[in-house]
């Protein structure tokens, strides 16, 4: 059964955040809220976590996983960003955007796109997620919690606990969450290519 953490949306309890971070460090797969919608997350490089996310969402090997980063300094450790792209990404973070960029050697090969050697990165504008990332001290490997054959992500922590109780290790609930995933922008070719229109405004990239 998954552990259930009821976390205050504006003033996250340090004890709960610490317990969630400890669980992630120990290999747990968690469901947690973001500024766009709920996500599945595990420790960077957790083969078991990656396999479980693929199984829950029925993803193939071409799926771009996302590294949920605390800030731009951390993001820069895992992707290569030239000056023009830097300005565009910097102006849009934190926020509901995922950027696909060339991966550095810090990113395990199993997380990189098999041909492009890219990875998704983002910096969330969400108090609870930021508290968890600060406590964890490293990015969370993440994927939108969108179940197969469903059009929208789940929005309520209790519903996620009820439906995924035996396939995730912890559920973080900080109240109602959105249903719209991030806007995905691919900068791996140098120019902005909008891969998915979502919660983030796309006009600045068009």
What is the predicted function of each stretch?
Residues 1-206:
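Active-site-adjacent structural elements in enzyme catalytic cores
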């Amino acid at each position: 059964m998954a552990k259930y953490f009821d976390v205050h949306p504006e003033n996250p309890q340090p004890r709960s955040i610490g317990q969630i971070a400890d669980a992630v460090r120990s290999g747990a797969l968690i469901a947690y809220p973001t500024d766009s919608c709920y996500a599945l997350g595990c420790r960077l490089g957790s083969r078991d976590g990656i396999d479980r996310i693929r199984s829950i969402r029925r993803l193939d090997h071409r799926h771009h996983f996302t590294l949920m980063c605390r800030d731009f300094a951390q993001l820069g450790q895992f992707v290569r960003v030239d000056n023009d792209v830097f300005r565009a990404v910097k102006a849009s973070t934190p926020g509901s955007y995922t950027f696909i960029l060339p991966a550095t050697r810090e990113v395990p090969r199993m997380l990189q796109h098999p041909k492009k050697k890219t990875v998704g990165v983002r910096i969330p504008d969400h108090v609870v997620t930021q508290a968890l990332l600060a406590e964890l001290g490293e990015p969370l490997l993440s994927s939108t919690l969108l179940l197969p054959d469903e059009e929208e992500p789940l929005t309520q922590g209790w519903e996620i606990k009820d439906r995924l109780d035996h396939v995730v290790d912890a559920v973080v609930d900080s109240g109602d969450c959105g249903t719209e995933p991030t806007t995905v922008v691919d900068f791996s070719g140098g120019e902005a290519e909008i891969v998915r229109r979502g919660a983030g405004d796309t006009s600045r990239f068009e």
